[in-house]
Amino acid sequence: MELSTLGLKDRAQWEAKGYQLPQFDRAAVTEATRENPCWIHFGAGNIFRAFQANVMQNILNRGEMETGLIVAEGFDYEIIEKMNRPHDDYSILVTLKADGSVEKTVVGSVVESCILDSENEGEYGRLKEIFCKQSLQMVSFTITEKGYSLVNGKGELLPAVAADFAAGPEKPASYIGKVASLLYTRFKNGQLPIAMVSMDNCSHNGDKLYAAIHTFAEKWAENGLAEKEFVSYVNDREKVSFPWSMIDKITPRPDASVEEILKKDEIDGLDPVVTSKNTYVAPFVNAEECEYLVIEDWFPNGRPELEKGGIMFTDRATVDKVEKMKVCTCLNPLHTALAVFGCLLGYTKISDEMKDAELRKMVERIGYTEGLPVVVDPGILDPKEFIDTVLNVRIPNPFMPDTPQRIATDTSQKLAIRFGETVKNYLASKDKDIKNLKLIPLVFAGWLRYLMAVDDNGEKFELSPDPLLETVCPVVAGIKFGDTDVEEMIRPLLTNRAIFGVDLYEAGLAGLTVQYFKELIAGAGAVRATIKKYV
């Protein structure tokens, strides 16, 4: 069996092995999309293949749309060359269910793939043609948060960006420069309206995309390389929109155990490819069943009816509330708590931690008892139901190969948002008492204990990458098991608003955090004993 147009001609063979196949006339959809494209997506990675492409397939299967998806890749051209095109833009989605079963779907809603290469006249010419079409309603992105950045870590312009500012929209080299150039083509073709929709997992993502595109428009206009009207076009809400969105679906990299399932089905050409840019790609993608995509309903040229596929459309304030609900209460804090204590207790799978009665009780109390009373309720999603799904379906899913070590990455950058906002909400509330927070301070103390890089058995372990390690690790470097006179040593961290979002002394949580920390460093086995004592 081969994943291609030819290989899928024998539908019965695929269906006999349990595959759900496209139920629409793909040739007709391909032709309609080529003539009148509606939606192009930048970023041909796993989240797109597992989520947006499958949503579109379900809508096409029901005959509720006539056009499919076009995908463009601008970071790693080999994804298109080595994965999309050899398989005629088909891919296999393996949905990993919490009960241990899998669902296998051949996704065929992507009917054209493009390479975002301004040096390649054929590829770039086709993208310009797409951007000139009146029918185009939505340009979406999953290019990661750093994909929108025009500067390096020191705040200096990236060389490709600086060169593009000077050279203009003709043949840009940077990713956002190319996107801005394509938007300029649309501007030149009658100032046609369009929605530019970031679907990356970062707060206020539409603003990040706008800031990047707007900067290019301004620089080109300043340098006489584009009309001033192009800046006005980018700023005109009736012509170009940059909606906010919130996305949530875990799509780990293609897993060997999933590959084995598909190999048993005798599908050829499944081997993953590591590209020269170190992207790990395969003809299949594995993902959890749960998915959420909430988009601000701001589409100057109309939009596809993606609500028919489960995507939610609402106003900006509600998108913001959904984001805060997820990041500050209902998912991310629970993940971080499990990550910190999982590393200390020697776990290598997040799902295994949910079989640990004490760790489970800890995150249940952080979510339901401490977080929910001050949660931001967005209205379109129920926060309690969201936590229920996180704790009973998503995190315990044994098929999701997620690790506490991965989630512990950059914890110093996460504590202020994931826990500090809840602390601030308690402090601001007239009827909530900060003294009711018992387990959030335990996570704070747990992170300080984690920084010692010694697990609960007294064995050294490697800390996950974090930009502040060089600053924070020396604070705990002199602390040993059994020390009790530690408060003054850790005070610089407890007062650090950048880390915790508040000064823990001013918030009234420092005393409890210090007490917990002393108990956590009492000796080998103290981490387990402390969790047991307080949950």
For the regions a protein language model found, what residue spans apply to each?
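Substrate/ligand-engaging "lid" and interaction regions
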Residues: 1-42, 46-535
